[in-house]
Amino acid sequence: GGSAPNVISEKCVVKLDTRYWNNEDDKYLDDGINKLAAAVWAPGVTQTIERVSHSNAMPLSDATKELVAQITEAAKLEGFDIDWVDAGGASDGNHMAEAGLPVIDGCGPAGGEFHCDREFLRLDTVEERIRMITRFLSLI
């Protein structure tokens, strides 16, 4: 960017990390970004889009819902409830889900503030999650 808000810079770089719940939203967003990039904003100004990486959305399949139910039951048998959240994001699980495999992403210890310097792990959940996964494996 420029040296001040009212100065036009020689070069500007914008980096986006986009997340979405379904592939239709990805297409909508991608089309919108490309439309903005194709616009003429000022004489001599050009825009270039470079997509560095991409993962399709991770759909919640019936097979995955069954795994969620089984892991939830395993947690109850171990004496605690597990709270499921739609976390979004991208992992190798997105690729496996796209191939039709059931995927559970995030059965480990509880924590928060992911991917930043405030990220934390709740140590009091480590043992219970090990018990939960062990119980789940014994049930399948």
Task: Go through the PLM ranges and name each one.
Residues 1-140:
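Metal-dependent amide/peptide-bond hydrolase catalytic core
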